[in-house]
Every structure is written in structure tokens, then in C-alpha cells.
UniProtKB/Swiss-Prot annotation:
It comes from Haemophilus ducreyi (strain 35000HP / ATCC 700724). Its main location: membrane. Belongs to the UPF0208 family. The lineage of its organism: Bacteria, Pseudomonadati, Pseudomonadota, Gammaproteobacteria, Pasteurellales. GO terms for cellular component: plasma membrane. Coiled coil: none annotated. This is UPF0208 membrane protein HD_1715.
């Protein structure tokens, strides 16, 4: 169970790094917004966790047992980026829906015609689609995404 969770988080990290940073993709999939939130959470949640503990420690009555609540809140705040990575890892292995499959096939045919890829994928997943979008970004730059 533990190794499955770690592998899923690693898949989410790979999906996060592969997915192109194009704002227009937010119109088609929620992944762009979630990836931005995960990156911001990874940056700011440790600071928030430290602040929550210090605030409760220094500014509350020491006779109250509020420090335990602050620690639980901090642990939850620190876990938020990992929850996002876990969701992205699950999403990366999910097969593409029919609504995105046509876009995947047309993009794949364009890249094959320019001899950028040769492989054939039986059941494309979101990770495969992110790989194609990243390759399209590297090949054509922002021009491809401006056409969307």
C-alpha cells in the first residue's frame, strides 16, 4: 500500500513537470489550475504550518491545550501539496475520455507527419497527452496553443 502511494505521488510529480504551462489549456482541462495550486501550496503551506504553530504557542493561554490543534492544522497544511500530487498521479494514469481523444489523435498525426514521434499507444492516458502537448510546445512553441 505504501509503495503504491509513493509511486502515485511520483507519477503526479512527473505529470506536473510534463504538463505545459499554457493558460489556454485551462479551458479544456482542470489540470492547469490544479498544477498551479499544487505548486503554490508546495511553496506556501510549510510557511503557514510554522506560522500556525508559532501563533498558537506564543499568543494563546498556555493552560489551554490548543497546541495540539495547531499541530494537527500544520500537518494538514503540509499534506495539501502531497494530496494534489496524489490526485495528479491518479489522473496521469486515467485513460483519456472520448472528448479529448480526437484532439490527441489529431495532434499525434501532426507530430508523426513532422517525424517527431514514431510510437503508437494502445490506450492513451493523460500522461501520454501531456507528453504530446509538451512535444508540441517544444516543436511549434506558443503558435500551436494560440490556434486553439
Amino acid at each position: 500500500m505504501r509503495s503504491i502511494m509513493i509511486n502515485t505521488i511520483q507519477l503526479g510529480q512527473r505529470y506536473l513537470e510534463t504538463y505545459p504551462n499554457q493558460k489556454k489549456l485551462a479551458l479544456f482541462m482542470p489540470d492547469y489550475r490544479l498544477i498551479r495550486l499544487v505548486k503554490q501550496a508546495a511553496r506556501f503551506m510549510p510557511i503557514f504550518a510554522c506560522f500556525a504553530i508559532l501563533w498558537q504557542y506564543f499568543f494563546t493561554d498556555p493552560t489551554q491545550s490548543i497546541l495540539a490543534n495547531a499541530i494537527i492544522t500544520s500537518l494538514f497544511a503540509i499534506s495539501l501539496p502531497y494530496q494534489g500530487l496524489y490526485w495528479l498521479g491518479k489522473r496521469a494514469n486515467t485513460p483519456l475520455p472520448l472528448s479529448l481523444l480526437d484532439w490527441y489523435q489529431s495532434l499525434k498525426q501532426k507530430l508523426i507527419s513532422e517525424q517527431k514521434i514514431m510510437q503508437d499507444q494502445a490506450v492513451p492516458s493523460y500522461q501520454d497527452f501531456a507528453n504530446l502537448l509538451k512535444l508540441a510546445e517544444e516543436t511549434w512553441g506558443d503558435n500551436y496553443f494560440n490556434e486553439l
